[in-house]
Amino acid sequence: MLARVGTTLFFLANALAAYAVSVTSPTRDTTWQSGQVNTVTWSSVSTDPEEMVIMLVNNAHYPNQNFNLGTVQSSAGSLDTDISISSDLPTDGWQIYFNGATSQNQGSLAQSEQFDFEGSDSTLAASTISGGIYSSTSASSTSSSTATPSSSSTTSSSSSSSSSTPISSSITSSISSSASSSVSSSSASSSGSISSADAKTVSASSNSTISGFSTSTTSASSSAAGNSSSSSYTSYSGAVSNGVAQLSVAACMGIAALMLIA
């Protein structure tokens, strides 16, 4: 007994789920123009079959007419048709049927209200139509999105800027600083003078006397260009003069001693 109740509820649930899809257009007040673009719209839920067969049906007149327009995704939400009907077919009492597309569910899922056709195509064979579904657009596909190439994304995400002083500039700056320091140091420690701002030449001289015996004179000059010159000379005139004077004094003292002895 419980098994039968469970089975009945199962099929009832499937039946209710199958009929969740609902046709919203065409309606009773709709008139399709034969041979022109006409639109079918519907709403669906996640429990509806993924695919549905679209049928154009007329059960209001005998013989009944059933035309298979094609299969669409139930999630599409709309489709366009370009159907023309032959001149012998009725212009009223038409409906759109949504049927199951699988062998497990081939029954009708939903039907539209009856609508009319206006016009016909006299070149068509009796009880025939031409055209059918020529486009089916999902409602969700109307939204658009743009994507950043990996390569651009990579370039954008990895792009950074850094500033560093070139090695040549650093070396030049260091050399200039050293040269400036050398010039300043030389000018501060010597009695020389900078003769030209452009040439940056430093000259210096010094004199020294050692014990009164010799005198040495040294002069030097240097430039920022890297050239330097120096000269030195030593004079012994002081030593010779002192020696002669001492000999003279000794001679005088010797003569005086001889005179006293005599």
From Swiss-Prot:
It is found in: Golgi apparatus membrane; Cell membrane. Residues 136-165, 175-194 are annotated as: Disordered. Glycans are attached at N207, N227. GO terms for cellular component: external side of plasma membrane; fungal-type cell wall; Golgi membrane. It comes from the Eukaryota. Residues 1-20 form the signal peptide. The keyword Membrane applies. It is a lipid-anchor; GPI-anchor. InterPro entries: GPI-anchor_Adhesion_Reg (IPR052479), Kre9/Knh1-like_N (IPR018466). A lipid is attached at N242 (GPI-like-anchor amidated asparagine). Residues 243-262 form a propeptide. Keywords: Cell membrane, Glycoprotein, Golgi apparatus, GPI-anchor, Lipoprotein, Membrane, Signal. Belongs to the UPF0619 family. This is UPF0619 GPI-anchored membrane protein C1322.10. The lineage of its organism: Eukaryota, Fungi, Dikarya, Ascomycota, Taphrinomycotina.
